A protein has these predicted regions:
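Active-site acidic catalytic loop and adjacent metal/ATP-binding pocket
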Residues: 1-42
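Alpha-helical scaffolds flanking conserved acidic
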Residues: 74-81
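Catalytic core of nucleotide-sugar-dependent glycosyltransferases
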Residues: 57-58, 110-112
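Glycine-rich, phosphate-binding/catalytic loops in enzymes
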Residues: 19-21, 43-45, 62, 107-108
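Regulatory N- and C-terminal appendages and interdomain linkers associated
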Residues: 114-120
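Active-site activation/catalytic loop segments of kinase-like enzymes and analogous catalytic loops
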Residues: 39-70, 82-99
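The feature marks helicase ATPase cores and/or their adjacent C-terminal helical subdomains
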Residues: 1, 100-101, 106
């Protein structure tokens, strides 16, 4: 799949509705676009734009309706893509969420970042 690969706040253009709801209107700057896993986009989307909020991620996944194939082993896949991502999210993430530095394993960090069942 062709993916944007740099879905940061400055590449998403939106507009507030009269009711105060933000709506995406455009995605810009496809200079980093690559062929890759669709969930590669989730790394920056979740860790930067959603600020690692598991409830927001769960709502996004519910609306997006990924295939069972993509959801199988989701936490592990998402953490692998986080570790491989060209944009290193960890410095910013640990600065905003210092408690994450207390994780004693990658499995624990993966669970705290990506296990949407924790948000219920």
């Amino acid at each position: 799949s062709l993916i944007h690969a740099d879905l940061t706040r400055d590449h998403l253009l939106g507009q507030l509705s009269p009711h105060g709801n933000w709506r995406l209107r455009a995605i810009i700057d496809f200079g980093d676009a690559i062929s890759g896993d669709l969930f590669y986009e989730l790394v920056v989307l979740h860790l930067e734009i959603f600020d690692a909020d598991l409830h927001m991620l769960r709502e996004f996944l519910t609306a997006y309706q990924p295939s069972p194939f993509h959801l199988q082993g989701f936490v592990r896949k998402a953490m692998n893509l986080t570790l491989l991502h060209a944009y290193d999210p960890f410095n910013t993430l640990f600065a905003r969420h210092p408690a994450l530095r207390q994780c004693t394993s990658l499995n624990e960090l993966a669970s705290r970042l990506w296990d949407v069942s924790r948000s219920q």
